[in-house]
Amino acid sequence: MKRAFASLFVILILLASCKSKSEKITVKSEDGSKATIDVSSLADNAEKMKNRNEELQKLTPLTLDELKALLPEEIMGAKRDNMEATKMAGLANFSKADYKIDDSTDVSLSVFDCAGTAGAGYYNMAFLGMMSFEKDNEEEYTKTIDFKGDRAIESCRKKQNRCEFTFFGKDRYMVQLKGDNVGIDKLKQIGSDLPLK
């Protein structure tokens, strides 16, 4: 795990130090999708990731009951349903619940505890997705944003009203909100209201 993290850190530093005069790189695929990466912040983000990883490894992972307690009773007036909490060897422990607002509208909340060695490893994988980038095509868009002083990812399918919002909270939780017929602004508001930020 540490060897993989060290390799990743070196690659990120090399990318940042070898950047061209342009601080953003845009790649376009054959299907018209575009992805833009802001290389100016790679070195800073890699250092932040390394420091946070070291702190996460020192923390003790939560129990199943503590994980379940992270899930609110209600979101948007909908009661918590299909709740589960899972401890998996080698992966981050997580809790998850669904909140059905009506027949076509629902929110799913997942909270990953990034504490301990396994959780810190999950954080490293998830954090790579939080480097500064933007992807856009006819079907969907995904981009990193600033959310209360930290990186977050927002993603929406354009033809359906289906969005996802992922952020890091309380210096240990990777929080993911998914909404069917719930827009990205509403998911951000829900994320702001959770006691996890």
Model-found features: residue ranges?
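N-terminal export/targeting signals for secretion/compartment entry
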Residues: 1, 23-25
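Sec-dependent bacterial lipoprotein signal peptides
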Residues: 1-16
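Generic structural motif
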Residues: 4, 30, 42, 102-104, ...
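Residues at beta-strand starts and edge strands
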Residues: 9, 93, 105, 171-173
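Bacterial signal peptide processing site
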Residues: 18-21
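Post-signal peptide N-terminal segment of mature Sec-exported envelope proteins
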Residues: 26-52
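A short, solvent-exposed beta-edge/loop patch
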Residues: 41-45, 49-50, 135-197
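Short, solvent-exposed recognition patches
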Residues: 54-154
